[in-house]
Structure formats: C-alpha cells, structure tokens
Amino acid sequence: MALTAALKAQIAAWYKALQDQIPDFIPRAPQRQMIADVARTLAGEEGRHLAIEAPTGVGKTLSYLIPGIAIAREEQKTLVVSTANVALQDQIFSKDLPLLRKIIPDLRFTAAFGRGRYVCPRNLAALASSEPTQQDLLAFLDDELTPNNQEEQKRCARLKGDLDGYKWDGLRDHTDIAIDDDLWRRLSTDKASCLNRNCHYYRECPFFVARREIQEAEVVVANHALVMAAMESEAVLPEPKHLLLVLDEGHHLPDVARDALEMSAEITASWYRLQLDLFSKLVATCMEQFRPKTTPPLANPERLNAHCEEVYELIASLNAILNLYMPAAQEAEHRFAMGELPDEVMEICQRLAKLTETLRGLAESFLNDLSEKTGSHDIVRLHRVILQMNRALGMFEAQSKLWRLASMAQSSGAPVSKWATREIREGQLHVWFHCVGIRVSDQLERLLWRSVPHIIVTSATLRSLNSFSRLQEMSGLKEKAGDRFVALDSPFNHVEQGKLVIPQMRYEPTIDNEEQHIAEMAAYFREQLESKKHHGMLVLFASGRAMQRFLEHVADVRLLLLVQGDQPRYRLVELHRKRVESGERSVLVGLQSFAEGLDLKGELLTQVHIHKIAFPPIDSPVVITEGEWLKSLNRYPFEVQSLPSASFNLIQQVGRLIRSHACRGEVVIYDKRLLTKNYGQRLLNALPVFPIEQPAVPDVIVKPKAKPARRRRR
C-alpha cells in the first residue's frame, strides 16, 4: 500500500491536533522523523521491518501510535502495540490512548494484560463473603479462599462492590484500595487454577472480558510474551497477516523469545514418584466418577502403571548418573560443556520427551472431557478434579518441554546450555535439570519476521557500542532481508544539562577489591549526601551482594534510603516523589531493573550513582556455554558477548538522569576502568556527550575481608 496524499494529510492533522492537546508542547525534529519512518515502513513503502532507536524525549509512543492507527484504519488491520513491562503497557492504555481519543473520537482500544494482573471474580467472591456457607463451598476448591481477618474481608467486599458496580475493571493497578502481595496472590489466579468456561463467573470475568474486547479493538496493547504465544498458537490476536505490530522496549524481545527455549524443573526421583502416583490416582478418579465418552488407551490402569513405571525408572537412572558428576550429599552444580550430553543421558532424555508428552496428551484429553460435564455432575467435586487435572497438565507440559530441549543439540545454529543442580531444603536433597537456548533468531524469524508483513522494533536503547550488531545477532533482523536500522538524535543538550563524574578511586571494582572499593564508594556517597546539593538520588548496583555491603557501610542513614525489595517498586517510587516534593532528601537504591522504566524528572532525580560497569556474570552456565561456542568459531567472547552487554547496561543506567529539557544533574560512575582500560573509551563514546570531572575520594581504611563463597547462578 502506498502512502496516499489523504493518508499523509490525516497523519499530519492528528499530529497538529495533538500539539493543541499537550500544554507546552515542544516540536521535535526526531519525532517528526520517527513518524515518517514508521509510516513508510507500516505502509510497505520502505523495507521489511524497522528497528528505530528513539532516545528519551523523542516521544516515541505517540510517534508510532499516530501513523499506526491511520494505516491500520486504511488497511482494515489491527494495530498491536507490545511492551516488556506492565508499567509501560498501563501508561499506553491509561494515558496515551485516552489522549489520542480526544482527537480521534471513535478510537477503539483495549489491553491484553497477563492473567495474573486481573482479579479472579470467583476468588474475590469467596474472600469478600461473610456467609460461612458461601465460604465453605468455595474453600472446598482452594484452602486459601478464606479471608485472614475481618479487615481483609471488608477490603475484599469493597473491591467486589467496585467490580460489580463497574467502578473497577479488575486490574490490580487500577484501584486505590491497598492490596498487599499476599492478598493479591489469593485474589488472582493462574492458568492451572482457572476454570475457564466452566466457571460460573466466566461471562463477567475481567480477564475474559478483556480478551473478548480484542476482537472489536483497533488498537490492542499487549506484552511480548503474549504476542509470542499468540503467534505460536494463532489464538488471542488476529491472524499475523492482518496485524500491524509495534514492539516497544524491543531490546527485550530475544530474552522473551528465549523463554520458549528455557526450562528448569525438579527431577528428584522421590518427588517424581509422588507426582506420577498422584496422577494415576487422579486418572482412576476420573474413570470411576466422570467416565469419558471415549476412553483413552493409556487410561487403562495396567498400561498407565507400566508407562509411569518406565518414566520413574528412567528418572531414577538419570539421578544416579547425574550424582556421579556432583560431590555427594551437598549442594552442587554440573554443567555439560557446549551443551553436549553423554550418549547415555541423551538417550534417557529423548525417551523421557516421548513418555512425558504422552502423559501431557492424556491429561489434556481428560481435561477437555471434564470441561463438557458441568451440567451433569456435582459442580464442586467436578471443579475440584478440573483444577487438579489442570495442574497435572501444567506439570507434564513443563516436563515435556524440559526433555524436548535436553534432546536438542542446537537451536538457531547455537548449542543449548544444559546443567544439573542439587539443592538442600529442610535437610532433603533436591535435583534440578536446566536447559536454555543461547540463540533464538530462528524462532523469531518463524513466528514474527516471516509472519507479520511489517514490524516496528523500538526502544530508547537498541544499540550497544554505537552499533546495532548485537541486536541483529540476537534477533535475526538483518539488512540483507530489507530490514532498516535507524538511530534518532536526542532532543536534549547533554553538555549543558549534565556532567559525568568519575571519582579518583584507588581500587578497581573487582571481586578481590570489592570490600575496599565499596568502602570508597560509600565514603564519596556520604560526602555527596551531606552536601545537601541533591534532594533526589538514585544508586544502582550490578549485584545484590554489593548492594548489601554498601548498605552496611551507610547503615546510619538507612532511613533516607528506599531500597529495592523493601516494598514493591511502584510504592518506593511513590514515596520518593512525596519526599522530594515536600522538600526532603530521598535516595532510591536498586539493581539493574531500576535502570529501566524509571522516569523521574527535574528535582526528583538530579544525581545518579553507578557502582561499576555491569559485565554479565562470568559464572553463569549460559554465559560460559556461549563463550565456549564463540571460541569454537574463533570469535572473542569479550567483544561479542561481555562488552556489548556492559555498554547496553551502562547506557540505560546513565539514561535515568536527563528525562526532559528541565532536567539538570550529574552521573557518578565509581569505575576508573572507564579511563584506564582500552575498552573504557569505547564505552564512554556510546554515552551521551557529558563534560567529565574527576574529583578526589575521601580517605578510608578498610581491612580486607575474606572472600565470600560464591554459588554459580544462571
């Protein structure tokens, strides 16, 4: 389709009307460029797909929504906007699209949040009820569906009143009533516990109401995981050929796609025996009380017992083999080099893949049959069995996926990382098996790049080391296929608005020097805190261990610090805002996740402290396997893997500071390797251009601490 004069005029008119809606709107050349690039790509005028880096301040959301809606209407397609986190998804759904509705009055949009973000009306009714009979009936389905106290019951009753009165849409983030994590866990549900069409509340269930709205919407706001699942099953969303797709926060896409090639599950022999026995009893119950129309052959008790016995014997053999690779009776880990399993283990995994897939099929068959019996059996007993069968299906789905991955030699031309771990819980040994695919470009090509005609991949950060190479390698997007890669200029004047501070640290932030380095960092941070120049501060760490050591050094000012994990992130940010706006000092402290999606403008954040260059963990089995594979191809892992990842993380961290034209402040990076190592200049060159200062650090005396024992992690 060509961009007609009428379509261009419509996009321009909406953009002009938008300027009238936003107070103090500042026209930006990068925004106009993005609107044009997005329009040309979605209309099929230029290239296959577009990867466009739009720095903070460009206004990327509205830059893809305006042309996207115009072209979707012209082509009678659905515009799907996908994000990586709930905060951005909710911002688009609750703020950006309602703003556009003012200039596009008949705009129809909806959101497809994950099931866990919605209240389950069945659970809510149980927890809101003050009548013992109602509580007893529903508590029979789940022991946790009774309120802990009268105050909790009243809170749930208010929530139910809002839901029934259409004052609340059932989303956790859309109510002012406080819901702690424990209560929400009981109010919501997951796929395994959802009764779906068999539920009395199905028609008014907020989750299913939202899913039905998708069919009528012009714009659907989804998340990457849902989009990937929908492309795999051709469910929830319209057919790929009838979509226009925007992947916001597109740098997360390879990680989300990797979920399809990632599985960890317990394989302890005694645990497995218990699960198989419970499933056999469940099948017997179904055959006795809810006999299916057609009996699956495997439901025969003798056949099922023989099948489960073979599964158990294989699992027991695998446990015995894996134990030979790990020290006896203690926590341990064994990784298989290049993901290559011994022949004996590979044969076991291949057989388990077939056997557990058969059990998965049996569970699914019974579940489908049970779902058709709601009108002819005791509803409470039937629903109880449906829930149990749902959970069995989930377990066998996970096991089938695990052994299928374990049986794969490669994915997207790269090995599948495989390792086993042994843990001790309450004095008992538990064995786990793990599989993670290193590359997912083939999956993305099959599900997205080849299926959807035109896709926009965007984010404030898509490049690392000023290059799209890492994105191309991980995603499979490539110029040869007609994909375009565009990096927009920042609308901000970083030279005038901020500065980069690299203190003259005596120690590098290595494991050997960690204690001394953190002591120096704490001393400089304390000096900055005592100067009272900054009311809003952010401190970012590369590891939880380092963050805890830092907190020990500044324990006397702990009340000023809002630390990740103390409360949910959104509450920490709310409290930070309130403190700063009331003239108090406030310091947010967190890990890499706080370097993304945190939008604090002006006085809310004027100083960012970065512990060190965040290289990926060298003890991760996935990173080690990837390194082995790269070396086998005569590629240098540090250049391909570590440095691009560190650059990407650093760009995101530094990007927390300048969020608007009114922002002023400084970024403090406690890592002298930026100035002393050859790669340091390359990392600096990928950052916005700030003036650099190198102040002295207060003297500190620290006794070296014994090296902590490190456990490997993925």
Swiss-Prot record:
Keywords: 4Fe-4S, ATP-binding, DNA-binding, Helicase, Hydrolase, Iron, Iron-sulfur, Isomerase, Metal-binding, Nucleotide-binding. A motif (DEAH box) lies at residues 248-251. Gene3D superfamilies: P-loop containing nucleotide triphosphate hydrolases. GO terms for biological process: DNA repair; SOS response. [4Fe-4S] cluster binds at residues 120, 194, 199, 205. One of its GO terms (molecular function) is DNA/RNA helicase activity. Its cofactor is [4Fe-4S] cluster. The keyword DNA-binding applies. Residues 517-698 form the Helicase C-terminal domain. Its EC number is 5.6.2.3. InterPro entries: ATP-dep_Helicase_C, DEAD/DEAH_box_helicase_dom, DinG/Rad3-like, DinG_proteobact, Helic_SF1/SF2_ATP-bd_DinG/Rad3, Helicase-like_DEXD_c2, Helicase_ATP-bd, P-loop_NTPase. ATP binds at residues 54-61. Binds 1 [4Fe-4S] cluster. It comes from the Bacteria. Residues 17-294 form the Helicase ATP-binding domain. It catalyses: Couples ATP hydrolysis with the unwinding of duplex DNA at the replication fork by translocating in the 5'-3' direction. This creates two antiparallel DNA single strands (ssDNA). The leading ssDNA polymer is the template for DNA polymerase III holoenzyme which synthesizes a continuous strand; ATP + H2O = ADP + phosphate + H(+). The keyword Metal-binding applies. HAMAP family: DinG_proteobact (MF_02205). DNA-dependent ATPase and 5'-3' DNA helicase. Unwinds D-loops, R-loops, forked DNA and G-quadruplex DNA. Belongs to the helicase family. DinG subfamily. Type 1 sub-subfamily. This is ATP-dependent DNA helicase DinG. It comes from Salmonella typhimurium (strain LT2 / SGSC1412 / ATCC 700720).
